[in-house]
A protein has these predicted regions:
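Non-catalytic alpha-helical coupling and interface elements of nucleotide-dependent molecular machines
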Residues: 100-103, 223, 227, 248, ...
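Conserved protein kinase catalytic domain
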Residues: 73, 117, 172, 219, ...
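C-terminal coupling/interaction segments
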Residues: 268-332
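ABC transporter nucleotide-binding domain
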Residues: 172-272
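ABC transporter nucleotide-binding domains
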Residues: 2-4, 9-205, 210-211
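Non-catalytic surface loops within mature trypsin-like serine protease
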Residues: 26, 124, 234, 271-273, ...
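Hydrophobic/anchoring residues in structured secondary elements
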Residues: 9, 251-254, 297
Length: 332
């Protein structure tokens, strides 16, 4: 449904995105994830025809975004980060206006508007001026204008930003209800939304795609992150020294302990990839006479994956930059 191949956008000599490649299959919800400034919005604007690419191709429903821009726009619904709403129109009036400019036939407009209103749970607000709506309801109107012409592909840029927890849940459920009959790209930097909403995730950092997989697949690929949180009695240094010598232990982090537990120490043990040293950890502590109050298994989260991929990429890029700027031997 959506195919992006080696897409690049350069401003002057500065690349906003470079060789971005990914696919979204029909009916999928794909999270487009990255830190602020990673290139998410630039990619979304190219896909929706708002911005031309410097090089590369993007196709939606078989149509090239550059060569068949109008055909693409007829087949997508777009919710930018700031919804394009007219505050002095009613919800229903605004959606009729959008349906008309998006080419919905006159005889079908009322039905499409009613469908979008029902789908977005706006029945009680249909005759209310948009300026009187809460941010959560405005976001629903923004999604309604994106789907009123029933497009096969929907592109949502930060759809839950600025919403309160209840509004986030409502918008999340709405997006999930659109899956199957629509193909959705969800651009965000809010990690919980991705794991709760999306079938697959594409992570972009510094303008480049660094990973594409299911949320579960990404967590399984993490080089480290799973492990154990342990609370022990007595000398933490002794416990740490014991843990360092256990095969399969990759890293140890010190943790704060709960209030009123002055004699206890908290430790997080990060396991090496493919290792499960839990039994060895417990045996070593008990054999050494270290009091073991609690030992809890932990697993890598999408946040761990995100931090590893984006931080590693930044470190590698910075290191390369320093190397390239380093004077050659013999230079003064």
């Amino acid at each position: 449904m959506i195919e992006v191949e080696q897409l690049s956008k350069i401003y002057g000599s500065t690349p906003a995105i470079a060789d971005v490649t990914f696919k979204v299959e029909p009916g999928e919800i794909v999270g487009f994830l990255g830190p602020n400034g990673a290139g998410k919005t630039t990619t979304m604007r190219i896909l929706t025809g708002y911005l031309p690419a410097t090089s590369g191709t993007a196709r939606i429903a078989g149509y090239d975004v550059h060569e068949n821009s109008m055909a693409v726009r007829q087949r997508i619904g777009y919710l930018p980060e700031t919804p394009p709403l007219y505050p002095d129109m009613t919800v229903e009036g605004f959606l009729h206006f959008v349906a008309r400019i998006k080419g919905v036939a006159a005889g079908d407009r009322a039905g499409q508007v009613n469908w979008a209103i029902k789908r977005c749970n706006l029945l009680e607000k249909r005759r209310v001026l948009i300026r009187k709506l809460s941010k959560g309801f405005r976001q629903r109107v923004g999604i309604a204008q994106a789907i009123v012409h029933d497009p096969p592909a929907i592109i949502l840029d930060e759809p839950t930003v600025g919403l309160d927890p209840r509004q986030i849940i409502e918008v999340r459920n709405l997006i999930k209800s659109l899956a199957g009959s629509h193909t959705i790209i969800l651009s965000t930097h809010i990690l919980p939304e991705v794991s709760m909403t999306c079938n697959r995730v594409t992570i972009i950092n510094r303008g480049k795609v660094v990973a594409t997989n299911t949320p579960e697949g990404l967590m399984a690929q993490l080089t480290e992150g799973s492990g154990y949180e342990i609370e022990v009695d007595g000398d933490r240094d002794t416990a740490v020294e014991l843990l360092r010598n256990i095969p399969g232990v990759s890293r140890i982090e010190l943790l704060p302990v709960s209030y009123g537990a002055e004699n206890r120490a908290g430790v997080r043990v990060i396991s090496a990839t493919g290792s499960e040293p839990g039994r060895e950890i417990a045996a070593a502590l008990v054999s050494a006479g270290v009091g073991l109050y609690e030992m809890r298994r932990t697993t890598a989260s999408l946040e761990d994956v995100f931090l590893e991929l984006t931080t590693t990429e930044k470190v590698e890029t910075d290191a390369s930059s320093e190397a390239s700027n380093k004077p050659e031997s013999g230079e003064g």
